[in-house]
């Protein structure tokens, strides 16, 4: 499989709902998940290429010839672009971390959500007790609340708050894509370009979540040490640890083996169906609990496209085909 990186620059506010409570409208995360991205790409494929374009994308995902990661942050510095990975879910059990690290650094370590690719090996060695790791701040933007108004013909406008995220000028998000053929990557690149015009996440009708594709890079064509590391680790299915890059869930028949020796946290995935043809009334998708990106397993699983609504005019799927990064002890 060939892997590519697509780097996105957001032009304004974005709303990436948490999907884990009734208050998700009032706050925002700093990134979006692969299932959100896949749904948005499906809508774009349908708009651009009709039902055949949609079916092509669904088939590629279903047979595993197209893989998507969650979005992850990047930060441009004087030395180039730094890419980040989700912090692995591993137990900090070594005496080196507990005794030799200042209390302030220990607290900062616990709060970390992202690890720079450049120092990922150092971080992993610190978990194994082989070295110390000094955490660095990982802010890529700021939360910003905005007041919107719900307007109807029968009542006065009702104000409500929307949580939003604004990226710093030198920051954004990137996505890793795995494809078997170049034509698949070209197709996805077209969808990303068009999707950026309408936006991703919530409240796109009022302009949230719009982005531009800043760069598309094939990992095997790059001499950037970060991307060389990613290329090798993505292909390393035999490594003793597998870092999950896609918030997803194994199939029932994969569950027992996957969860053995895994360390993870669960995240709730829900939401309403964004389709004018599925049902005349708003319809909620089936709620599922996924392994959050950053989970560490001892083997890879295949996942699936899960059917999350069955009573409408067409099937509705939730993406759950994982991408893993092989990590050596």
Language model regions located:
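Conserved active-site/ligand-binding neighborhood in enzyme cores
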Residues: 1-329
């Amino acid at each position: 499989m060939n892997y590519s990186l697509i780097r996105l620059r957001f032009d304004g506010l974005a709303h990436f709902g948490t999907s884990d409570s009734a208050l998700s409208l009032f706050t925002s995360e700093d990134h979006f998940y692969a299932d959100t991205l896949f749904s948005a790409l499906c809508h774009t494929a349908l708009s651009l290429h009709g039902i055949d374009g949609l079916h092509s994308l669904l088939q590629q995902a279903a047979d595993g010839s197209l893989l998507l990661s969650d979005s992850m942050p990047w930060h441009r510095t004087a030395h180039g672009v730094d890419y980040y990975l989700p912090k692995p879910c591993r137990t900090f059990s070594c005496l080196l971390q507990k005794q030799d690290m200042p209390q302030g650094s220990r607290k900062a370590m616990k709060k970390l959500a992202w690890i720079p690719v450049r120092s990922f090996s150092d971080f992993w060695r610190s978990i194994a007790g082989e070295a110390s790791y000094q955490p660095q701040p990982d802010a890529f933007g700021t939360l910003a609340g905005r007041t919107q108004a719900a307007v109807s013909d029968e009542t006065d406008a009702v104000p409500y708050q929307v949580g939003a995220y604004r990226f710093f000028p030198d920051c954004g998000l990137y996505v890793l894509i795995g494809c078997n053929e170049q034509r698949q990557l070209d197709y996805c690149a077209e969808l990303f370009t068009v999707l950026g015009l309408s936006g991703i996440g919530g409240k796109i009708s009022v302009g949230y979540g719009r982005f531009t594709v800043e760069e598309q890079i094939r990992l095997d064509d790059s001499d950037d040490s970060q991307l060389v590391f990613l290329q090798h680790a993505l292909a390393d299915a035999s490594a003793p640890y597998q870092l999950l890059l896609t918030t997803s869930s194994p199939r029932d028949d994969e569950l027992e083996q996957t969860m053995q020796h895994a360390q993870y946290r669960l995240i709730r995935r829900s939401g309403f169906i964004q389709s004018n043809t599925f049902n005349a009334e708003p319809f909620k998708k089936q709620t599922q609990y996924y392994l959050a990106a950053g989970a560490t397993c001892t083997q890879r699983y295949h996942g699936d496209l899960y059917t999350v609504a069955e009573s409408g005019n067409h099937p509705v799927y939730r993406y759950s085909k994982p991408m893993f990064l092989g990590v050596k002890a």
